[in-house]
Amino acid sequence: MARLGRTGFLTLAVVFHLIYAYSIFDIYFVSPIVSGMRPFRVEREPGSEAPAKRLVLFVADGLRADKAFELTPDPDLPEESNGDDLTFLAPFIRSRVLSHGTFGISHTRVPTESRPGHVALIAGLYEDVSAVTTGWKLNPVNFDSVFNRSRHTWSWGSPDILLMFKEGAVPGRVDADTYGEELEDFTSDATALDIWVFDKVKELFASAKKDPELNAKLREDKNVFFLHLLGLDTTGHGYRPYSKEYLRNIKLVDQGIKEISQLVEDFYGDDKTAFVFTADHGMSDWGSHGDGHPDNTRTPLVVWGSGVAPPKQPQHGVPSGHEDGVSADWHLNQVQRNDVAQADVAALMAYLVGLDFPTNSVGQLPLEYVDGTPREKALAALANTQEVLEMYHVKEEHKKAALLRYRPFEPLASDYGNSAEQRLAMIKDLIDRGFYEDAIETSAALFATALEGLRYLQTYDWLFLRTIVTFGYVGWIAYALTTVIHLHVLHGASESDRTTASISFFSSVLVALFSVFLYQGSPWRYYLYGFFPIFFWEEVFARRKAFHAGRAGALLLPKRDLHSNKVEDIDTITYGGAFMLLTGLLYLLFEDEILGTSHQPAAVSRKGSRNIMGLQLGMVLLALIVTRSSAASLQAKQGLPFGNQVVGWGVLIASLLLPFAHRLYPNSHYLHRLMIIFLTFSPTFIILTISYEGLFYFAFCMTLVTWVRLEHATYVYTAKPVAKQAQETIEPPKKANPGATTVVDGETYRFRTLTVSDARVALFFFFLLQSAFFSTGNIASISSFSLDSVYRLIPVFNPFSQGALLILKLLIPFAIISANLGILNRRLEVAPSALFMVVMAISDVMTLNFFYMVRDEGSWLDIGTTISHFCIASFLCTFVAGLEFLSEVFISGVDFGLRTDAITASVPDIVNGITSKGQKDVPNGVEDKE
């Protein structure tokens, strides 16, 4: 309600936007996982067996497809070589492509992170995008997988991947041998991780020669061996994928795979082993992944061994797979390239070893990789299609049971003569009559239709939920504008006007919505989604007189993506730190001229404050020195010296605590307070910067100070004629408007009414807020943030601590802008939070636009970008509310040099939610207060 006042309004804004920001995951990214499906496997002739008895899966975490196949300068040559000696880094893998198996590119989905990538490879399932938040935790995999369908799986590698698959499988079915997380050091030689895995595999087969029980277990069929090779991912993060370290790691992985393949073949000696080599995701040029850039989504896929089709030469007039030009410099044009979706790999592995297809798999068996008769391929395609249809039928039954009225998917509805059972019977008849190619084509068409049916069920509730959310956002915009007009234009003069009919109407709609949610067993969040639109529009209707009295304009804000593909540059870091240091020194030297003599504090207080500021400058200098030393040591691959790490943490913590010492020697001038805040965060920005961010911080702070002074000068200039006219009038001064008051530091002050020119201030703030978001890194793609800076404090893999440091760096510009706007708010003599409320009212025009632009299919880059855009726009309002509270902390006790009127009488505080109705007139006696 408009009576909520300032604190209530800001709290409501935060709660509403946090809840509605989650709505895209309830609408667009509902988990596809269901249970209760029957498993399906390929039907084989009596006495026949699966193509392979066992399967070995190699996953090179973070390996790009191009780096695996292209010609590259030999990383082992000395530095002085001219670089003309080009070589293939993975000769063994290349030999499998050319003469032993089938290859292609496995295209991944966003988020290109380890957990979703491995889930797609091993379960054939694309998790919803929000599942990336569990990628760094030990979390049971609550869906079916190839490991779960195997007789037994042995796995080696990182605990982040192996343990979650072990916990989610049938007890005792998966063995996971992992190394400690302390080995995942980004500043050390990560090849040790892969060597550890290869050595453990060799130990297992060596032990089998002495252990008859283990030997017998290893020789059973339907076994899977999983080697998770994390070295490339760790090396790529630390040194970039074009570094010699990354290229050497590729050579080591290739040699290790060669040795393990030979070891397995020698141990069994039956040529009944299938081998799969791939990656969970790629790696960008700046050593990160997560978004949909092609370098992250293209991974190699090489399959060879028992049951795998040999390499095929491209036929004239038939697509070779190389038409897109991606593999033009791989020198593999003489071999057919067969690209697949990442989830297809799970279906391929299940087929090769004769397992049931994972029941949640949406992967389509790539028949180009299968070495079998046309009948075998037709039966395999049929079983693959039956598995997906089974998932469709189960999900459809769940949907029917939950809805008041269900409309079936026409292409698979029996009412329309298109039942899946009829089409399956037709496929079986084609196989029985020997029309295998027709059966394969029909199965593929039915498979695609089943996926469309799953898509139909996944999006069934979209229209209903999106309509509710749209009414919620539009209602918030109208409610916020009504509140601003009521509080800061009409000063509480408008009254609510509810009628019995309006109360009955809105109550009936709310009851109807809640009844539908209750019948359908909807999550508790749906009730909140439905409550907010009713609440907002009921308030807008009740305050419609205030809305009609004001004038609201639609503000369209241009927006663009900024990309920040940065590399570490010590000189640029130094320039930024030098500007920060120079700014502080110049302030200390010319403090009297900057502040003016009329605002000088007591001599003791002035000296103490200058001494503390001198210590802050010392922290800036020390941060610059230790950052240069740490960066040089890391670039020289000497690791992070322990002393540097201790000093870095000491400077970071001390610089954030030192400003509190200024309370002992207060200097209340607003420029002095801004300089303290500037120097407080300077050491943090120096330590956590890798390139131009320090220069941005300096320029951003100077721009904000200039903006504050310019807006105040503009306000004084435009108000001067009015003041002069007031002095010349012979009429007695009018009483102060009792509605235009607020409480500041325990006293009541007069504030002015908002005008059209204040929209300019709000727009400038909105622009600067966008700059704070995007200038230190493209938050639309979190992978654009480099980890180089956090290595100076945390060199060992610790995602939560490293992420916290990156978030701290990201939030600093918001702290700076909140302090400046808080000061500007007071200098312009408008009510606290007035400008913040205007910004919150206009920001959701952009939010609603991005809500309808969210996509959950198509280009993976588009999916990730649209989600990020919506979340950024939605959280902007939440940030603004938080910044408003933060600004009060930063400007507490600041002297603004204003002529404000202290009102001696006790008056209600409209901004804090009390109406002016019945308020007594305020006395004329006002007292100038500096």
Curated annotation (Swiss-Prot):
SUPFAM superfamilies: Alkaline phosphatase-like. InterPro entries: Alkaline_phosphatase_core_sf (IPR017850), GPI_EtnP_transferase_1 (IPR007070), GPI_EtnP_transferase_1_C (IPR017852), Phosphodiest/P_Trfase (IPR002591), PIGN_N (IPR037671). The keyword Oxidoreductase does not apply. Keywords: Cell wall biogenesis/degradation, Endoplasmic reticulum, Glycoprotein, GPI-anchor biosynthesis, Membrane, Transferase, Transmembrane, Transmembrane helix. It is found in: Endoplasmic reticulum membrane. GO terms for biological process: cell wall organization; GPI anchor biosynthetic process. Signal peptide: none annotated. Pathway: Glycolipid biosynthesis; glycosylphosphatidylinositol-anchor biosynthesis. Its EC number is 2.-.-.-. One of its GO terms (cellular component) is endoplasmic reticulum membrane. Glycans are attached at N148. The chain crosses the membrane at residues 9-29, 467-487, 499-519, 522-542, 570-590, 612-632, 640-660, 685-705, 762-782, 804-824, 834-854, 871-891. Residues 30-466, 520-521, 591-611, 661-684, 783-803, 855-870 are lumenal. Residues 1-8, 488-498, 543-569, 633-639, 706-761, 825-833, 892-930 are cytoplasmic. One of its GO terms (molecular function) is mannose-ethanolamine phosphotransferase activity. PANTHER family: GPI ETHANOLAMINE PHOSPHATE TRANSFERASE 1 (PTHR12250:SF0), PHOSPHATIDYLINOSITOL GLYCAN, CLASS N (PTHR12250). This is GPI ethanolamine phosphate transferase 1. It comes from Emericella nidulans (strain FGSC A4 / ATCC 38163 / CBS 112.46 / NRRL 194 / M139) (Aspergillus nidulans).
